[in-house]
Amino acid sequence: IKKNPSDLPLASGRLITDLNYRHWDEYVETIPHPFLADVTAEGITEGTDILADEPYECPMKPFGGVEQLAWSPDSKSIAYTCRKKSGVEYATSTDSDIYLYELATKQTKNLCKPAGYVAPKNDTSKSKKFQAVNSAENLKNNPGYDINPKFSPDGKRIAWQSMAHDGYESDRNRLCVYDFATGTKQYVTEKFDSNVDDFCWMADSKTITFIGVWHGCVNMYRTDLTGKVEQITNDCADFVSVSLANSGNKLLAIRQSMSAPNDIFVVTPEKKAEKSKVQQLTSENKEILSQLSLGKVTERWVKTTDGKDMLVWVVLPSDFDENKKYPALLFCE
């Protein structure tokens, strides 16, 4: 209700008539749109809404940011992430797509789905897992969560993170590559049995570096357009971002571990992960860390009740003595 009734001037209640009315800790009161404007010496011109008259958000709430948009290298088009659904359909679906907006024509194309695509009807009384939207036939139409597009340096391809299934928020993020010349898509990290997080194109426009978790550590990997995946780093740490540095021979990254907070590193990739050079550039918390005594962190593998191997991280006290007994704090996730 935009205006309180005259007899209830202090009322703070809300009249909810449809989903989705809330994201985590905030009510849906605005619909963000990206705008294009010229920046001149005289100031900024009036912006052009690239989603004009569309009731859909970009970036997507609640966590989306500028990473959900990308300029093409020739500056003639913009790729953006959007879930063009509303009401109950919006609230129960994770089906977002990557769209290409042409600046000259103001035309938009969905890169995930064929022209004229109509999604199978959704029965909200049943699990999405067993519905037509997640059938083998429809999975080729990217019914899952597609986000964060990035153009190749030569502008011939675009890559993004892609989940296979609609309604499954914990699905595996794969790397999808779209070829503008052929209009075809391919998934180049199918051989990597884990999640693809941040990624960047290399200067050759044929290789993509990405970060992914394996056995409790987040390292760097690379993949080519054939689907081959190779490990770049082998650290007992977590890389949380990656971008191209220098002339394209090095990578700029943020890295953290259970013993150190975020700092900026430069990585020089080699064919074997053990030979890649990882150089720390910043030591933002050096003074604070110098005053702390941190315990050793070790990994252990234990057998579960069903005979499988489970990874356990053990963080020892800073003054650990193996001849003494210590109370233990067990954290399960």
Show the residue positions of the predicted features:
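Residue-level detector of Asp-centered blade-edge/turn motifs that repeat once per structural unit
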Residues: P73-D74, P153-D154, A203-D204, N246-S247
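Hydrophobic beta-strand positions that form the internal "hydrophobic ladder"
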Residues: I78, G155-I158, I208, I232, ...
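Short glycine/acidic-enriched loop and turn motifs that connect beta-strands
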Residues: K85-V88, A164-Y168, W214-C217, S257-A260
